[in-house]
């Protein structure tokens, strides 16, 4: 007599695992041609939406919701691009951009912000020898993709 609940993963699990592995290997094959981008914004909905737009535009997009999480992700993801909000708690986007430039000098960086008053942050970065391209939020998806592509051509 068996007490409690029992279940079997059986064929459904095996088929699901095989599909997952096949999708992952297909993604690895595509990734060589697709640029990788890390989207960083503490506004989760905006970060998620931006990443979805960029995925549809041909980028492999990952999301971080703060600067520290972004730095951790970069160690394994190695993005070609970093798109980060400027005004975030703990580590602002300019600080993240500077740290990224020092650790991953080939990563192309674009800042975006919907808040006034970021000029002081950007000026401090400039004094330290770092200058970054800035897009104003809200930004039309086509302008975002266009800006990133022009950044990639530099």
Give a label for each model feature.
Residues 1-36, 140-154:
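Non-catalytic signal-transmission and effector/linker regions of two-component phosphorelay proteins
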Residues 48-56:
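Charged docking surfaces used in two-component/phosphorelay signaling
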Residues 58-65, 73, 135:
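Short hydrophobic/Thr-rich beta-strand motif most characteristic of the beta2 strand and flanking loop
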Residues 65-69, 92-96:
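Acidic catalytic/metal-coordinating carboxylates
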Residues 75-77, 100-107, 127-129:
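Conserved phosphotransfer cores of two-component systems
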Residues 77-83, 110:
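Active-site beta3 strand of CheY-like receiver
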Residues 88:
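Receiver (REC) domain active-site loop signature in two-component systems and cognate sites
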Residues 112-114:
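Hydrophobic/aromatic residues positioned on beta-strands within the core alpha/beta folds
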């Amino acid at each position: 007599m068996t007490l409690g609940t029992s279940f079997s993963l059986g064929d459904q699990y095996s088929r699901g695992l095989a599909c997952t592995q096949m999708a992952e290997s297909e993604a690895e094959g595509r990734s060589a041609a697709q640029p990788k981008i890390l989207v960083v914004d503490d506004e989760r909905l905006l970060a998620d939406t931006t990443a979805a737009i960029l995925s549809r535009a041909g980028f492999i997009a990952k999301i971080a919701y703060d600067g520290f999480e972004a730095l951790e992700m970069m160690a394994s993801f190695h993005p070609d691009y970093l798109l980060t909000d400027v005004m975030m708690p703990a580590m602002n986007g300019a600080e993240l951009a500077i740290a990224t430039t020092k650790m991953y000098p080939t990563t192309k960086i674009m800042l975006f912000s919907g808040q006034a008053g970021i000029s002081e942050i950007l000026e401090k970065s400039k004094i330290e020898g770092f200058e970054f391209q800035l897009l104003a939020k809200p930004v039309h998806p086509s302008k975002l993709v266009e800006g990133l592509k022009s950044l990639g051509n530099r």
